[in-house]
Every structure is written in C-alpha cells, then in structure tokens.
Swiss-Prot record:
Catalytic activity: L-homoserine + ATP = O-phospho-L-homoserine + ADP + H(+)
Phylogenetic placement of the source organism: Bacteria, Bacillati, Bacillota, Bacilli, Bacillales
Annotated protein name in UniProt: Homoserine kinase
Function according to Swiss-Prot or TrEMBL: Catalyzes the ATP-dependent phosphorylation of L-homoserine to L-homoserine phosphate.
UniProt keyword ATP-binding, yes or no: yes
GO cellular component, one term: cytoplasm
Family from the record: Belongs to the GHMP kinase family. Homoserine kinase subfamily.
Compartment(s): Cytoplasm
One GO biological process term: threonine biosynthetic process
InterPro entries to which the protein is assigned, alphabetical: GHMP_kinase_C_dom (IPR013750), GHMP_kinase_C_sf (IPR036554), GHMP_kinase_N_dom (IPR006204), GHMP_knse_ATP-bd_CS (IPR006203), Homoserine_kinase (IPR000870), Ribosomal_Su5_D2-typ_SF (IPR020568), Ribsml_uS5_D2-typ_fold_subgr (IPR014721)
Pathway: Amino-acid biosynthesis; L-threonine biosynthesis; L-threonine from L-aspartate: step 4/5
Keyword terms, alphabetized: Amino-acid biosynthesis, ATP-binding, Cytoplasm, Kinase, Nucleotide-binding, Threonine biosynthesis, Transferase
A Pfam family it matches: GHMP_kinases_C
Entry binding sites for ATP: 91-101
Amino acid sequence: MNEAEMLFSITVPGSTANLGPGFDSVGMALSRYLKLSVFRNDEWQFSAETETVAGIPQGTDNLIYQVAKRTADRYQKELPPAHVKVWSDIPLARGLGSSAAAIVAAIELADELCGLQLSESDKLHLASLEEGHPDNAAASLAGGLVIGLHEEGETHIVRVAEADIDVVAVIPFYEVLTRDARDVLPKELPYRHAVKASAVSNLLVAAIMSNDWALAGKMMRKDILHQPYRAMLVPELSKVEHAAEMKGAYGTALSGAGPTILVLIEKGKGEELRKQLSEHFPHCEIAALTVPSEGSVIERNPLEQVKSV
C-alpha cells in the first residue's frame, strides 16, 4: 500500500460544549484534530497512527464504521470496504469532543465512499441524531462557535465564525465518562432556578454574539444547570477557576462533561497563561489552543480523481 492508493483524507477539529450555562447548545471548535486517511481495501480495517487512539477496534466494531454504515443504510447505499488510518491528538473521554469528531468523520466517510452528496445541513442533522445534541458535532463540522438546537425532525444552528480569544485547556489524566457525568445531574429543577438559568444562558449567548468576552466570562461562572453538580467529579475546577481569575482570564468552565477545564483569555495571552498554569497544575496537561474557523475538511487524492475522469 502506498500514498498513491489513498482515496482521500478527512480532518475534523475537536470541540468543547456548554461554556458553562450554554448546556447542550453552545459548542466551539478547538485546535486538536482527528484525521482519517482512507485507502482501498478488500475488507474494513482501522489502524491507529497515534498513541491517543491506540487500542481502537480494528474492524466493524469501530464507532466510525458503525456510524458510516448507519449513514449509508439511511440512504440505501452499500458501504464499500476501506482501510482507514486514524490519527488523533484529541484525548478520549476528556470532554474535548473526541466522539463527536469521530461521528462527523464517519458521516464524511460515508458521504465520500457512497457518493451521497450530503449538504452541510444533512450532515449536521445526522451527527446530531447520533449525539443527541448539536453542540460538539456542529462545531466540528462547521468550525468556529455555534449555538444550536436539535429536534428529531430538524436541527438548527447559528454560527459565530470568529471567536477572538485564546483558549487554555487544563487536561487531567483521568477520564470522566459522559454517562457518569449525566448521572450526577438532578432529574428536575425548581421553576425559579430554571428561569434564572434561562436568563444566564441568554446573556451568555448575547455576550458571545457581541464579542463581549468579559461579560461572557461572568455568565460562565453563574451556571446552575450542570457545573455545580459535576464539580465533585473534577476537583481541579475551583482551583483552576481561582488561578485563572488571578491572571486576568475572562472565564473558566468545564469542557463538556469534563474533566478538561477551559480558560478563555484575551487573544495573544494564551501561551503566557499556559506556562503559569503549568506551574500550578503539574499533574495535568496544559495546552494553549485556538478556535479554528474551519470545520471538517476533505482532501481528495489527485491521482484518484484523474482515474475517475
């Protein structure tokens, strides 16, 4: 097998969700990536190219295959076999959108292999059906920052192309599974709490749309929907929040269900904050990230395109 036999590659950014009170609605792309290199093959095979994805299922029990197969079946198409090399620096089960990136990549994979000619709206809805909510998937698909709502028959998003901030991620080395993070949430909220949560979330979105990140950071601290309950699973949260506030950051929030903690800070100050937080949290990976404006990208092998002419 050589590079000339490669059909195409798929690159998908990771993501964060919620930013505090934007629960299951606000998503933002992050500069960690999943890349699939797709080759002709007689049977389905997945091989890991980085330590991050070492141990992934190598056959049809792989999540990427399963989502691609469901996508092809939905359009009554046969999914031809391929060898997929998987490269990723998105850590698994850390709240950085690894599963959403895999789902988006799988839908792109089915679209390319089966010639489905899916629109971005189609891809978004299919990914949201898989995820149950649009935040991570929409950010990985479209890039930038998104606010969305998923319903069974339709998925709606509004995209903010430019998030003019730096992001520093504090990534603990332990995992928090989404189902465990869901289990600690209350089954219901008192009405007055729901009203306050709605107001805080509304103001968060208004601040984001106005590029008022200082106000957005204040609203991130006022979340009452999930972070107060999930804090018990991530003991670093309050410590990172305090340290970041002392360094002049806009705001701090759990990334998705955690355990990664995101700190938003003025553009150009991310690397300095990364160094400072590294001193305080030596037991965590501290990464300076950006918000890519571009989402998933397909690169086709020009030699394969010539063959198909």
